[in-house]
Amino acid sequence: MRYDFVIIGAGPAGEAAAYLARSRGASVAVIDRDLFGGSCPHWGCVPSKSLLNAASLHAAGGDYPWQRASDRRDYMINRVGLDYPDDTGHVRGLRDAGADTFRGVGRLDGPGRVVVRHEAVEHPLEGRHVMLAVGSETKMPPIEGIDGVRTWTNRDATAARELPASLLVLGGGPTGVELAQVYARFGVPVTIVQSGPRLIPTDHPRNSAAALLAMQRDGVDVRLGVRAVRARPAGDPARPDVIELDDGSTAAGHAVLLAVGRTIPLGGLGLETVGLQAGGVPHDGRLRLQDGLYLVGDCAGPELHTHQAHYQGELAVRMALGDDVAPDYRALPRATYTDPELASVGVTLEEAMAAGLDAFEVVADFPTTAKGYSVEAAFGHVTIVVDRGSRHLVGAAMATPDASAAIHECVLAIKARVPVAVLADTIHAFPSTSRILNGLFAEAARSLG
């Protein structure tokens, strides 16, 4: 069978590509070996945010025990009464849009050719454009004996129906801190081991500091600057497994959550049939590996976000169909949904100056603002970075209760290159986090003269 687009992977990037391609009149085949919809709605973004909300209510004294949180989570991921989420809605949506869906392992079989294998049956497909949207997988850290302990991936952590007696989180990125807060707020003793000097190292340093305060407030034992080197299985379900650290100390947990990063599953895709190697497949900056072959989503970089995957899936379709567009990541937002939320976009002051910009930053201490007073905030910040040369915003970060929403004014300002003077002259509702931004824009405008 021949299609305009053959898409391997039905996560956010693959689904977005399929829907847009069908809306443009293209024929589409979508392949996935596991759940249509990908990790986000079933094991990642959706269940974790449901659990974070439940944990927040529980911590505030609401009637929200773990069983209720678990039941709500199962409802959200279509797993009520099941051992595995039901992706029927995702499959139906694609088919209703006119796409053909294939469950099985898809691999390249030469330029423009894909073979789908399912239960020993192979289906050959041809595509004018082939898109690889295979997502990412949990990275197994190089720790001696790790195979012998009770490890969790993010799937296990977001799907658990029983609370562990204790939890050890290896890795202090967004996944690690979000799930640490969930379990800590339900009364589980939690330890985070982070090899670097700060949590969420890809985010703004002030956000990292806020994340540390949030973890400590909720009773999480955070170990920074130490690396796990050896695992000692307990051999008894009632006792925790022990992880030896490179400073001579130990950390323990009845469950050990692996949150040290992600790997890209490019092996087994048949890349060698088109002259490529799985070990290194850089795209051309326009998501193309070669004519007619695109790489989108987590496997394309530069970061790992569902919203980036959605953007790239649609963008690749537009480029394949001849639109004059190219990727633009200047205004790529990042959000971590802890309490408080953490969000950022663009560059830090240090990054701006390293890039040769004549930049400065303006910072508000969130607890001293009207919004901060109203929510009794103990810590947090709102920061903007401005380029004197262009008089534009080039970066922003915040740790506030609604940061994931409030950051988008800055996302739009960076994307559209809105002058700081215009941002300062725009009326913002009081008291809100956006109003704090308004004050920072005004201060920046005065500094610019």
Please identify what each model-predicted range represents.
Residues D100-R103, R107-H118, F186-G285, L289, ...:
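A Rossmann-like FAD-binding core segment of flavoenzymes
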Residues C45, A133-P189, V193, E272-L289:
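Glycine-rich dinucleotide-binding loop and its adjacent helix/turn
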